[in-house]
Amino acid sequence: SRIAASDLVPSSLREAAEQAASRQIRHLATLGGNLCQHTRCGYYRLRSFPSLKRGDDTCPVQADGAVQETAGIFENRPCACAHPSSVAPSIGTCDATVHVVGAEGERAVPFAALWAAPEKGRASDTVLAATDVITHVELAARDAAAGWRVAHEEIRQKAAFDWPLVSCAVALRVEGDAVAEASVWLGAVAPTPIRSGAAEAALVGKPFDAKRAASAGEAAVEGATPLAGTRYKLQLVRVAVRRAVAKAWGRS
């Protein structure tokens, strides 16, 4: 709740924090907890089903043709889980550094290096050990005075107390009528939060207009490998990126 109300963090992170969970949960929740939460995949959560992350040989989602809310469309082999953190994309756009203390002492972990690809028997999606604790997260400035414009966008089924089906955060550094620098991160579409270099390339160095935002959305789904039950997320990604880019551009 303090992050959602703080003027010290970018508006995109405030928006993401304000939409997470419920007011009661936000009062008790932490940024580190949101980043390190485990997947919501039903096969992982229910021990009556096999799960690669629990040490079984298969990921049932791969063969399940039903619509999947908690599965991704990128990097979804051998495990198709989607990372549920609602604040991770916004933190990613700020070139964050995660500060950790553990049995080996203190260390700083670049945000992009925090994440670990799924492995058989590995429950965590981060490189942190069981004894590690996130003490704080350091964000690079995204000041409007320096030309930065940021936005967060997510698509979900319910307006409150729900996880996003797809989320996107955007940071644009604007010079004149063009984007000089861009950072586009996606959530809920892969086992870890991912950065979309293709969407960034569609924006940087080009005059901005409504078509440019749509082009970024199209570029964002390049390389996707959706399963039968997650193809719908392709369009959600296109829409979320287009909305986030347009929203960021409209801010000064």
Language-model region placement:
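C-terminal structural segment of proteins
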Residues: S1-S252
